[in-house]
């Protein structure tokens, strides 16, 4: 029997997802469709009767607004929320702002897949002359980060390396206290948590596509090991379509 339940939700589609651009640490907001996804995710949690005690999210508005929208739908906007850069999306470095299909046409789909999906190969770094360098690196929300902590680009391995200490030190104690935890974050920071929970290989986590705006439920034993595979809250068709849409990103438009 499950000792704990954990709910993860990847933010709804952002304005830059809609334009098929690499977002990374750029603070893109939700698109209208992404807002609807978050609403549906919240309604699925409401319909299933979920209650939470504490929430965690990144410092990026697409995840924060997804969380707000979910909390509104379940009428739990009063819950405490912890925001941290450690749950931010992977930093896509010099690729930030580029259209994924155009990048695939220029560098080849195989190279784009390596940058997007390889475990330990980072994209090219974001140099000071990048159009979004000041927008990200000089943003005051990151003023307390040391030079070592503030990335210019990240591989998935790098993203997981900065997300997992927060998971272990801040989130795990809350779960073990019996708190019902909701995490609203990003595809790659959530991948880190999923890889850790399920003990997935580097290859397996690279191929895992988490759908946007759909609550992911884990039932965990007392050692925080899943007692069954992740479950999605939502109808099967919604879940299938969402996962296919994520897999289709980064392919050359025919």
From Swiss-Prot:
It holds the Pfam family His_Phos_1. InterPro entries: His_Pase_superF_clade-1, His_PPase_superfam, PG/BPGM_mutase_AS, Phosphogly_mut1. SMART domains: PGAM. It is an enzyme of class 5 (isomerase). The record marks 186 as: Transition state stabilizer. The modification Phosphoserine is found at residues 14, 23, 31, 118. The modification N6-acetyllysine is found at residues 106, 251, 253-254. Its EC number is 5.4.2.11, 5.4.2.4. The active site is at residues 11, 89. Belongs to the phosphoglycerate mutase family. BPG-dependent PGAM subfamily. Homodimer. Catalyzes the interconversion of 2-phosphoglycerate and 3-phosphoglyceratea crucial step in glycolysis, by using 2,3-bisphosphoglycerate. Also catalyzes the interconversion of (2R)-2,3-bisphosphoglycerate and (2R)-3-phospho-glyceroyl phosphate. This is Phosphoglycerate mutase 1.
